[in-house]
Every structure is written in C-alpha cells, then in structure tokens.
Amino acid sequence: LPDQVPTGGDGVWAHFFGQEAYSMTLAARLAQMNGVATLFFVGERLPHGRGFALHVYPLEGEIGRDKLANVETINRNVEKLIRLFPSQYLFSYNRFKTPAGAEPKPSSGLKD
C-alpha cells in the first residue's frame, strides 16, 4: 500500500496530488530490485454485490538510484489509478500530515 503514511523517519516528502505528502519508500525500494516487475493491483468493487474485478497495471516510468525520484514515480502511478477508479479509493487517515519523528515539510511548495 504505497499511499500509506509511514512512521517518522521511514519516508520522504514527495508529490502526491500536487501536495507534499510524507510517503513510504518501501515500494520504491522493492521496485529497485533487479529483474523484478513492479505491478499495481486494483480491486474494483462491482455494483449490486456482484463481487470484484481485479485490474493489474505495470509501473509507468523508470526506477533509478534517486530515492525521491523513485517515490514520486510510485506516487504518480498511484495517482493515475485513483483517477481511473475514483469511487473505489477511500482512506480514513490524514494523508498529508506530518508524522511524529518525521522531518518537517519542506518550506518550498511542490505545486505543479
């Protein structure tokens, strides 16, 4: 779940829907492994209790050596999937908070 808020010290500040969000680095680190395909899975709840449809998407973009660039690549992919299935995305936590122990948000805005 790359859109979860990591504990302080376990993430980086990166773009997420045009705002600075403390983002986990685990998905980006896993994507750096040689020979490993990075896939995103979306479970779409079908109407009228008909079950679920599973959608699988490959990573779009490159994963390199730069941790922040890699996390932002993951975040862009998550944003794309949320835009494809906006009614399916729900979270009940403050995605843009500063967790205890995290570096403060950068003072320069990251707005696109």
Q: Positions of the model-derived regions?
A:
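Non-catalytic C-terminal accessory region of glycerolipid acyltransferases
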Residues: L1-D112
